[in-house]
């Protein structure tokens, strides 16, 4: 219901973003990436494309803000997390929730410890504690000689800790608090 309303309300913005992407670079406006959802079920996540076509074949899954695979408008879309809006489609399809641990790519899920597998016990979401902490992951990775190593050593452990915190604490009130904090970060910085 909420995702349906969100899609209707943001449809003019969707159209504007699609036009910007199509004018900026060749290829589809939407990117569909492989992610792992609740109970380890794979699904395709929708995002507005912020990278060159076939960028995932040119490098790893971690993306620094200065990654040469990024399109010209990627910075704008990522700054306001507009590239994430199509995930409302995933929410509508029941593959994701508004709040929950961000869905991971299969290669990272394969690295989960037994304890970390608890992350897969709840639906993945568009935002969570970890999203608030690493709001601009690309900026953290900017200038890194090895973005993947930086991600694995500096970002991933904290994301996992915060995702497990969400699994332990999740409730309607926690979800509401995370949504409000996410909106605050989006609009107030």
Predicted features by range, described:
Residues 16-19, 34, 108-109, 113-121, ...:
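Intrinsically disordered, low-complexity boundary segments flanking structured domains
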Residues 121-189:
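C-terminal terminal-structure detector
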Residues 22-23, 79, 91, 135:
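Conserved catalytic core of Hanks-type protein kinase domains
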Residues 1-53, 166-189:
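A hydrophobic, helix-centered structural microdomain
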Residues 64-129, 177-179:
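A short, structured surface patch at a secondary-structure boundary
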Residues 3, 31, 71-75, 107, ...:
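Positions in alpha-helical segments
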Residues 31-69, 129-156:
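Short, glycine-rich, amphipathic interfacial segments at transmembrane boundaries or analogous
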């Amino acid at each position: 219901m909420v995702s349906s309303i969100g899609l209707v309300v943001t449809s003019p913005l969707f159209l504007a973003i699609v036009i910007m992407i199509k004018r900026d670079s060749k290829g589809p406006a939407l990117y569909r990436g492989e992610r792992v959802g609740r109970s380890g079920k794979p699904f395709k996540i929708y995002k507005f494309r912020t990278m060159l076509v076939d960028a995932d074949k040119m490098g790893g899954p971690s993306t620094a803000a200065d990654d040469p695979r990024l399109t010209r408008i990627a910075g704008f879309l990522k700054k306001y997390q507009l590239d994430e809006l199509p995930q409302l489609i995933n929410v509508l399809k029941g593959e994701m929730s508004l709040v929950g641990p961000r869905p991971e790519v299969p290669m990272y899920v394969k690295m989960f410890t037994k304890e970390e597998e608890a992350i897969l016990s709840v639906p993945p979401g568009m935002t969570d504690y970890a999203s608030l902490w690493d709001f601009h992951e690309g900026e953290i990775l900017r200038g890194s000689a090895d973005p993947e190593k930086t991600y694995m050593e500096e970002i991933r452990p904290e994301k996992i800790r915060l995702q497990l915190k969400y699994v332990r604490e999740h409730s309607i009130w926690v979800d509401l608090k995370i949504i409000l904090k996410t909106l605050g970060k989006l609009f107030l910085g």
